[in-house]
Amino acid sequence: MARYRRHSRSRSRSRYRRRRRRRSRHHNRRTYRRSRRHSRRRRGRRRGYSRRRYSRRGRRRY
């Protein structure tokens, strides 16, 4: 039983970590600052963000 418990715990933890990491990418100021130069061009094409929506935000910010 102890073994099973340990396993399940690690499994759930990894899942949580994955989810959190994905979110931190957008809301992390350090990474945002670093990739500010390339983020504008790359993000729109690569991830498929709508250009209208992104340009509105980007223009105001940058």
UniProtKB/Swiss-Prot annotation:
InterPro entries: Protamine_P1
GO molecular function, one term: DNA binding
Keyword terms of this UniProt record: Chromosome, Developmental protein, Differentiation, DNA condensation, DNA-binding, Nucleosome core, Nucleus, Spermatogenesis
Main localisation: nucleus
GO cellular component: nucleosome; nucleus
Protein location: Nucleus; Chromosome
Region (Disordered): 1-62
Tissues where the protein occurs: Testis.
PROSITE patterns in the record: PROTAMINE_P1
The organism's place on the tree of life at top rank: Eukaryota
Functional description taken from the UniProt entry: Protamines substitute for histones in the chromatin of sperm during the haploid phase of spermatogenesis. They compact sperm DNA into a highly condensed, stable and inactive complex.
Family: Belongs to the protamine P1 family.
Protein's name in the database: Sperm protamine P1
The organism of origin for this protein: Antechinomys laniger (Eastern jerboa marsupial)
